[in-house]
């Protein structure tokens, strides 16, 4: 079974800090093709901006591998017009893309900052997404 996900930037950052962490496992699943990343140019811009911040000290090669893999495996979508309130306007693009995807398929927004998004069953933490993946393996 394929899962369609929008990965919030904080999930990608956490994954690069520790590939063995739950966010790291989610990123690995995306790069392996079990999880299909849902993308938008604005999301890629955010990934690029945040991952290249000097404070994180990520190896450029690791960033390139992650972003190239997400692009290769991902699907680019338009952003839906939303009526739900998203407290941080910078995060709206993640919610807009998941809402666009949900018009045609089940899709999840995976974030470490649940409070930044409307309370919906498809807005999940990395741990919840991993539970969904493992549950449906059985």
What spans do the regions from the language model cover?
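Acidic, PIN/NYN-like endoribonuclease modules and their adjacent C-terminal/linker elements
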Residues: 103-138
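Acidic catalytic patch
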Residues: 41-44, 62-86
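Extreme N-terminal starter segment of soluble prokaryotic enzymes
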Residues: 2-4
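Acidic, metal-coordinating catalytic cores used for nucleic-acid/nucleotide bond scission
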Residues: 84-90, 115
């Amino acid at each position: 079974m394929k899962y369609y996900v929008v990965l919030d930037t904080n999930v990608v950052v956490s994954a690069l800090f520790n590939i063995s962490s739950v966010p790291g496992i989610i990123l690995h699943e995306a790069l392996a093709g079990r999880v299909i990343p849902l993308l938008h140019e604005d999301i890629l811009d955010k990934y690029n901006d945040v991952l290249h911040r000097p404070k994180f000290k990520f190896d450029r090669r690791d960033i390139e591998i992650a972003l190239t893999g997400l692009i290769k495996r991902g699907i680019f979508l338009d952003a839906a017009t939303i009526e739900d309130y998203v407290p941080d306007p910078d995060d709206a693009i993640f919610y807009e893309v998941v809402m666009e995807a949900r018009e045609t398929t089940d899709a999840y927004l995976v974030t470490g900052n649940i409070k930044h998004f409307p309370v919906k069953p498809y807005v999940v933490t990395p741990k919840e997404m991993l539970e969904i993946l493992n549950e449906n393996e059985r």
